[in-house]
UniProtKB/Swiss-Prot annotation:
Family: Belongs to the UPF0325 family.
Lineage: Bacteria, Pseudomonadati, Pseudomonadota, Gammaproteobacteria, Vibrionales
Organism: Vibrio cholerae serotype O1 (strain ATCC 39315 / El Tor Inaba N16961)
A Pfam family annotated for this UniProt entry: DUF3461
Name listed for the protein in its UniProt record: UPF0325 protein VC_2264
InterPro entries: UPF0325
Length: 127
């Protein structure tokens, strides 16, 4: 019923609660969250990274100028279609988009801070 999710190793797609999708450099990062099981402190999640497809698009036919653009991976769109059938997400309004951007920014701050701490710890090990 959900061949693309099963192909990712998700054997029980009905246990999916929600998902998030964000872009990092030239990759799209899909994170799938599962329903919390009895006795678990946190819900289980898995993360998948998909390279963005790069295309050259003609900008000006007179001067034959091309611009490199990236777009979502076709396999990822198929996975998202299946996820939407399971989670039935709400359509975001304009205010929600602003909040999503702010949430993405806060997440990025945490990721960068964590990476800096990891690198500093590695440096300490060298001393």
């Amino acid at each position: 019923m959900f061949p693309h999710l099963v192909g990712l190793g998700i054997n029980e797609p009905t246990q999916i609660e929600r998902y998030s999708l964000r872009q990092e450099a030239h990759k799209d990062v899909l994170k799938i969250y599962f329903k919390k099981q009895k006795g678990e402190l946190f819900a289980k999640s898995v993360k998948f990274k998909y390279p963005r497809q790069i295309k050259n698009v003609l900008v000006d036919s007179g001067s034959h100028q091309y611009k490199e653009v990236t777009e979502i991976n076709r396999n990822l769109t198929l996975v998202i279609d299946e996820l939407n059938k399971i989670t039935k997400p709400e359509v975001m309004g304009e205010v929600d988009v602003k909040q999503k951007i702010l949430n993405d920014l806060r997440h990025l701050e945490k990721v960068v801070a964590s990476k800096i701490a990891e690198i500093e710890a590695d440096l300490q090990k060298l001393n």
